[in-house]
Amino acid sequence: MLDTIELSKKLIEFDSVTPAKQDIFDFLIKIFKEQGFDTKQLNFDGDGSYEVINLMATYGSPQTNGKHFNFLCHVDVVPPGNIEDWDTHPFEPTIKDGYL
């Protein structure tokens, strides 16, 4: 079973400032597949200046009217601004006072 804190920490480590890079999607695809999901990467032109990547993960089959779960997301983040303004580095996960 996945540990949500450890998974969150690994996701935070990715510098996924828009446009998000392929490495975070490769990581997520691996995680989803290990959990039994089917995955599909969706690439779009965005505004034409960069490629936008989204990921769809499906557990179960919607075609059989059985129970299923779909996860569709993008994983890019806004630029962090001046790193020196942060208490901790935005891409170095830190647990402080019980909070990640």
Predicted regions: what they are:
Residues 15, 25, 40-41, 75-78, ...:
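Short secondary-structure boundary micro-motifs
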Residues 6-15:
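Generic N-terminal amphipathic, Lys/Arg-enriched alpha-helix
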Residues 14, 18, 99:
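Active-site oxyanion-binding pockets that recognize sulfate/phosphate
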Residues 17-65, 91-92:
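A non-catalytic alpha/beta surface segment that caps or lines the substrate-entry region
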Residues 1-2:
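Basic/polar N-terminal segments that are highly enriched at the extreme N-terminus
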Residues 68-100:
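Active-site metal-coordination/substrate-binding segment of hydrolases
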Residues 5-6, 26:
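Generic alpha-helical structural signal
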